[in-house]
Protein backbone atom coordinates (compact mmCIF):
# COMPACT_ATOMS: atom_id res chain seq x y z
CA UNK A 1 0.00 0.00 0.00
CA UNK A 2 2.83 2.40 0.90
CA UNK A 3 4.60 1.53 -2.35
CA UNK A 4 1.44 2.28 -4.35
CA UNK A 5 1.08 5.63 -2.55
CA UNK A 6 4.70 6.56 -3.29
CA UNK A 7 4.33 5.66 -6.98
CA UNK A 8 1.10 7.67 -7.33
CA UNK A 9 2.74 10.64 -5.58
CA UNK A 10 5.73 10.44 -7.93
CA UNK A 11 3.42 10.31 -10.95
CA UNK A 12 1.53 13.35 -9.66
CA UNK A 13 4.78 15.28 -9.31
CA UNK A 14 5.70 14.52 -12.92
CA UNK A 15 2.32 14.70 -14.67
CA UNK A 16 0.47 17.46 -12.81
CA UNK A 17 3.09 20.23 -13.21
CA UNK A 18 3.30 19.62 -16.96
CA UNK A 19 -0.50 19.79 -17.20
CA UNK A 20 -0.62 22.91 -15.04
CA UNK A 21 1.76 24.74 -17.35
CA UNK A 22 -0.58 24.34 -20.30
CA UNK A 23 -3.78 25.12 -18.39
CA UNK A 24 -2.69 28.02 -16.22
CA UNK A 25 -3.95 31.36 -17.54
CA UNK A 26 -0.87 33.21 -16.31
CA UNK A 27 1.31 31.14 -18.64
CA UNK A 28 -0.67 32.08 -21.74
CA UNK A 29 0.30 34.85 -24.09
CA UNK A 30 -1.38 38.09 -22.97
CA UNK A 31 -2.30 38.96 -26.56
CA UNK A 32 -5.02 36.30 -26.34
CA UNK A 33 -6.92 38.53 -23.91
CA UNK A 34 -7.51 41.57 -26.10
CA UNK A 35 -10.81 43.39 -26.25
CA UNK A 36 -12.78 42.71 -29.43
CA UNK A 37 -12.88 45.57 -31.91
CA UNK A 38 -16.62 45.39 -32.50
CA UNK A 39 -19.67 44.51 -30.46
CA UNK A 40 -21.31 41.22 -31.28
CA UNK A 41 -25.01 41.95 -31.08
CA UNK A 42 -27.38 39.76 -33.02
CA UNK A 43 -30.89 40.82 -33.99
CA UNK A 44 -33.70 38.90 -32.36
CA UNK A 45 -35.21 36.25 -34.62
CA UNK A 46 -38.57 37.34 -36.08
CA UNK A 47 -40.38 34.33 -34.61
CA UNK A 48 -39.86 35.58 -31.04
CA UNK A 49 -42.83 37.79 -30.20
CA UNK A 50 -42.08 40.91 -28.18
CA UNK A 51 -45.11 42.14 -26.24
CA UNK A 52 -46.06 45.78 -26.61
CA UNK A 53 -45.86 47.87 -23.47
CA UNK A 54 -49.39 49.08 -22.62
CA UNK A 55 -49.85 52.83 -22.85
CA UNK A 56 -51.43 54.58 -19.88
CA UNK A 57 -53.06 57.75 -21.21
CA UNK A 58 -55.11 58.49 -18.07
CA UNK A 59 -52.20 58.11 -15.65
CA UNK A 60 -51.60 61.26 -13.56
CA UNK A 61 -48.23 62.95 -14.11
CA UNK A 62 -46.98 62.40 -10.54
CA UNK A 63 -47.95 58.72 -10.64
CA UNK A 64 -46.16 58.34 -13.97
CA UNK A 65 -43.03 59.97 -12.55
CA UNK A 66 -43.07 57.64 -9.55
CA UNK A 67 -43.45 54.62 -11.83
CA UNK A 68 -40.60 55.81 -14.05
CA UNK A 69 -38.40 56.37 -11.00
CA UNK A 70 -38.97 52.76 -9.96
CA UNK A 71 -38.52 51.39 -13.49
CA UNK A 72 -35.29 53.34 -13.93
CA UNK A 73 -33.82 51.75 -10.81
CA UNK A 74 -34.94 48.17 -11.55
CA UNK A 75 -33.83 47.46 -15.10
CA UNK A 76 -32.19 44.09 -14.45
CA UNK A 77 -28.91 45.36 -15.82
CA UNK A 78 -26.50 47.17 -13.50
CA UNK A 79 -25.14 49.49 -16.19
CA UNK A 80 -28.58 50.85 -17.02
CA UNK A 81 -29.62 50.88 -13.36
CA UNK A 82 -26.75 53.26 -12.61
CA UNK A 83 -27.14 55.43 -15.71
CA UNK A 84 -30.92 55.76 -15.61
CA UNK A 85 -31.32 56.10 -11.84
CA UNK A 86 -28.78 58.93 -11.68
CA UNK A 87 -30.38 60.55 -14.73
CA UNK A 88 -33.85 60.38 -13.17
CA UNK A 89 -32.61 61.66 -9.81
CA UNK A 90 -31.17 64.70 -11.56
CA UNK A 91 -33.84 65.54 -14.17
CA UNK A 92 -37.20 63.79 -13.64
CA UNK A 93 -38.67 66.29 -11.16
CA UNK A 94 -38.33 69.12 -13.69
CA UNK A 95 -39.73 67.18 -16.68
CA UNK A 96 -42.89 68.45 -18.33
CA UNK A 97 -45.69 66.04 -19.26
CA UNK A 98 -44.34 65.78 -22.83
CA UNK A 99 -40.77 65.11 -21.65
CA UNK A 100 -42.04 62.51 -19.19
CA UNK A 101 -43.93 60.78 -22.02
CA UNK A 102 -40.75 60.78 -24.15
CA UNK A 103 -38.78 59.21 -21.31
CA UNK A 104 -41.55 56.64 -20.76
CA UNK A 105 -41.44 55.72 -24.46
CA UNK A 106 -37.66 55.45 -24.33
CA UNK A 107 -37.33 53.06 -21.40
CA UNK A 108 -40.51 51.07 -22.03
CA UNK A 109 -40.73 51.14 -25.83
CA UNK A 110 -37.42 49.36 -26.36
CA UNK A 111 -37.47 45.59 -25.99
CA UNK A 112 -33.75 45.26 -25.24
CA UNK A 113 -32.01 47.21 -22.48
CA UNK A 114 -28.68 46.81 -24.23
CA UNK A 115 -30.04 49.00 -27.01
CA UNK A 116 -30.64 51.83 -24.54
CA UNK A 117 -27.12 51.38 -23.16
CA UNK A 118 -25.49 51.37 -26.61
CA UNK A 119 -27.46 54.43 -27.74
CA UNK A 120 -26.76 56.38 -24.55
CA UNK A 121 -23.04 55.64 -24.72
CA UNK A 122 -23.10 56.38 -28.47
CA UNK A 123 -21.69 52.97 -29.29
CA UNK A 124 -24.50 52.42 -31.80
CA UNK A 125 -26.52 55.04 -33.66
CA UNK A 126 -29.88 55.93 -32.14
CA UNK A 127 -32.90 55.17 -34.36
CA UNK A 128 -34.87 58.28 -35.37
CA UNK A 129 -37.95 57.32 -33.33
CA UNK A 130 -35.88 57.36 -30.13
CA UNK A 131 -33.62 60.29 -31.00
CA UNK A 132 -35.55 62.81 -28.90
CA UNK A 133 -34.76 65.69 -26.59
CA UNK A 134 -34.68 63.25 -23.67
CA UNK A 135 -32.25 60.90 -25.43
CA UNK A 136 -29.91 63.81 -26.18
CA UNK A 137 -30.12 64.85 -22.52
CA UNK A 138 -29.36 61.25 -21.47
CA UNK A 139 -26.33 61.15 -23.78
CA UNK A 140 -25.00 64.34 -22.20
CA UNK A 141 -25.61 62.84 -18.75
CA UNK A 142 -23.70 59.69 -19.71
CA UNK A 143 -20.70 61.75 -20.88
CA UNK A 144 -20.44 62.94 -17.26
CA UNK A 145 -18.73 66.27 -17.92
CA UNK A 146 -18.92 67.05 -14.18
CA UNK A 147 -16.92 63.87 -13.41
CA UNK A 148 -19.43 62.72 -10.80
CA UNK A 149 -18.80 59.26 -9.34
CA UNK A 150 -21.67 56.95 -10.18
CA UNK A 151 -20.80 53.75 -8.41
CA UNK A 152 -24.17 53.28 -6.73
CA UNK A 153 -27.75 54.37 -7.20
CA UNK A 154 -28.82 57.61 -5.54
CA UNK A 155 -30.95 57.45 -2.41
CA UNK A 156 -34.70 57.68 -2.85
From Swiss-Prot:
Keyword Chloroplast (UniProt): no
Organism (species): Drosophila ananassae (Fruit fly)
Subcellular location: Mitochondrion matrix
GO cellular component, one term: mitochondrion
Assembly and binders: Interacts with the flavoprotein subunit within the SDH catalytic dimer.
Stated role: Plays an essential role in the assembly of succinate dehydrogenase (SDH), an enzyme complex (also referred to as respiratory complex II) that is a component of both the tricarboxylic acid (TCA) cycle and the mitochondrial electron transport chain, and which couples the oxidation of succinate to fumarate with the reduction of ubiquinone (coenzyme Q) to ubiquinol. Required for flavinylation (covalent attachment of FAD) of the flavoprotein subunit of the SDH catalytic dimer.
Presequence extent in this chain: 1-24
Region (Disordered): 35-62
Keyword vocabulary terms for this entry: Chaperone, Mitochondrion, Transit peptide
The protein's name: Succinate dehydrogenase assembly factor 2-A, mitochondrial
Amino acid sequence: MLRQFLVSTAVRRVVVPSMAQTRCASNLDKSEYTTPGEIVDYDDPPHIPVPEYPSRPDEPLETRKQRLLYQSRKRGMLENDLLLSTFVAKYLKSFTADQTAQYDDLINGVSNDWDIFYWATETKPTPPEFDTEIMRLLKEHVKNAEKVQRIRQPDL
